[in-house]
UniProtKB/Swiss-Prot annotation:
It is found in: Cytoplasm; Cell junction. Keywords: Cell junction, Cytoplasm, Developmental protein, Differentiation, Disease variant, Ectodermal dysplasia, Phosphoprotein. This is Keratinocyte differentiation factor 1. Plays a role in the regulation of the epidermis formation during early development. Required both as an inhibitor of basal cell proliferation and a promoter of differentiation of basal progenitor cell progeny. The gene is KDF1. Residues 1-60, 123-156, 307-340, 369-392 are annotated as: Disordered. It is linked to Ectodermal dysplasia 12, hypohidrotic/hair/tooth/nail type: A form of ectodermal dysplasia, a disorder due to abnormal development of two or more ectodermal structures. ECTD12 is an autosomal dominant, hypohidrotic form characterized by sparse hair (atrichosis or hypotrichosis), abnormal or missing teeth, and the inability to sweat due to defective development of sweat glands. Pfam families: DUF4656 (PF15551).
């Protein structure tokens, strides 16, 4: 019985509200086939069901359950962090090159890679057009491969990573002549300048020397007896021997030591003219350039200074000078200045002085001092007490 004030419902299915209407939602994704219609599953009624209703059909609504599962995967690609990860993966090669060249990925790697990529790209494209259909060969290698082989040949076979950089600075600097000029706003850093040579470092073998690649052997005093041959057929070892001769004739051992140790500037100031004359004579006699002559002269000085244990040859001029002025003493540097002086016992003159009257009186003033002095020479010591040594303890004056 309907309540008063309410109309009687019409016969037919009941009308549902807007919140009760079944809605069909469909999410379309790109590059995916359309989904098939939802399947229906039939379930038999439970035999224990007292109502024994007909078979019940269960329909899976796509707008209620399925979108809740698929929406996270569909919207996952549009998350910010996912997009950044994909962008980093796509730009991995460019960012890697930028990190190697600049130390950081700045402005999307455009300052560091714009100039070089454009030049390399045009060169590769031109080479591909010219050699289209031609089989590859070592003579017709692409520009990038040729540059890599040229750089590897200049560096040697032991270093096969020319593009290694430390904090943006290349470990092995590229040649300045072939490297393009960087842009004004580029983030690439200039390579560090070559360190200045050490002050006390030995001179290295000069590349311009015609005998720079030869090996220099040490020599003994027996090598000094080699016959002097012509300058055209003389070897590097024989030239070093002759320089050794000239050094020992021109300078003393002490002066060569000071030249090698660099302890005295006065020696260089006094001997500048002699050293320059010696260098000029070496260059003229042996047909060497000035740098090679200086290097050989320095090596000869150091070789003579470091071979103190062996006897050094003495020239006749040096012996006559030392014999004429025996009182002149060389300045003491504290490093074995008396070794190898060249004086022998045959050159020394031993003189024995004759006894004078003053020497005889002095010997008589010392009792028991002279050998063979008689014990009973002085009678004043008779009858005095003596100790175990026999020397008198008390002198009695009568």
């Amino acid at each position: 019985m309907p309540r008063p004030g309410h109309p009687r419902p019409a016969s037919g299915p009941p009308r549902l509200g807007p919140w009760e209407r079944p809605t069909e939602l469909c999410l379309e994704t790109y590059d995916k086939p359309p989904q098939p219609p939802p399947s229906r599953r039939t379930r038999r009624p439970d035999p224990k069901d007292p109502g024994h209703h007909g078979p019940e059909s269960i329909t899976f609504i796509s707008g209620s359950a399925e979108p809740a599962l698929e929406s996270p995967t569909c919207c996952l690609l549009w998350r910010p962090w996912v997009w950044e990860w994909c962008r980093a993966a796509f730009c991995f090669r460019r960012c890697r090159d930028c990190l190697q060249r600049c130390g950081a990925c700045v402005r999307g790697c455009s300052p560091c890679l714009s100039t070089e990529d454009s030049t390399e790209g045009t060169a590769e494209a031109n080479w591909a057009k010219e050699h289209n259909g031609v089989p590859p060969s070592p003579d017709r290698a692409p520009p990038s491969r040729r540059d890599g082989q040229r750089l590897k040949s200049t560096m040697g076979s032991s270093f096969s990573y020319p593009d290694v950089k430390l904090k943006g600075i290349p470990v092995y600097p590229y040649p300045r002549a072939t490297s393009p000029a960087p842009d004004a706003d580029s983030c690439c850093k200039e390579p560090l300048a070559d360190p200045p040579p050490m002050r006390h470092s030995l001179p290295s073998t000069f590349a311009s020397s015609p005998r720079g690649s030869e090996e220099y052997y040490s020599f003994h005093e027996s090598d000094l007896d080699l016959p002097e041959m012509g300058s055209g057929s003389m070897s590097s070892r024989e030239i070093d021997v002759l320089i050794f001769k000239k050094l020992t004739e021109l300078f003393s051992v002490h002066q060569i030591d000071e030249l090698a140790k660099c302890t005295s500037d006065t020696v260089f100031l006094e001997k500048t003219s002699k050293i320059s004359d010696l260098i000029s004579s070496i260059t003229q006699d042996y047909h060497l350039d000035e740098q090679d002559a200086e290097g050989r002269l320095v090596r000869g000085i150091i070789r003579i200074s470091t071979r103190k244990s062996r006897a050094r040859p003495q020239t006749s001029e040096g012996r006559s000078t030392r014999a004429a002025a025996p009182t002149a003493a060389a300045p003491d540097s504290g490093h074995e200045t008396m070794v190898g002086s060249g004086l022998s016992q045959d050159e020394l003159t031993v003189q024995i002085s004759q006894e004078t009257t003053a020497d005889a009186i002095a010997r008589k003033l010392r009792p028991y001092g002279a050998p063979g002095y008689p014990a009973s020479h002085d009678s004043s010591f008779q009858g005095t007490d003596t100790d175990s040594s026999g020397a008198p303890l008390l002198q009695v004056y009568c």
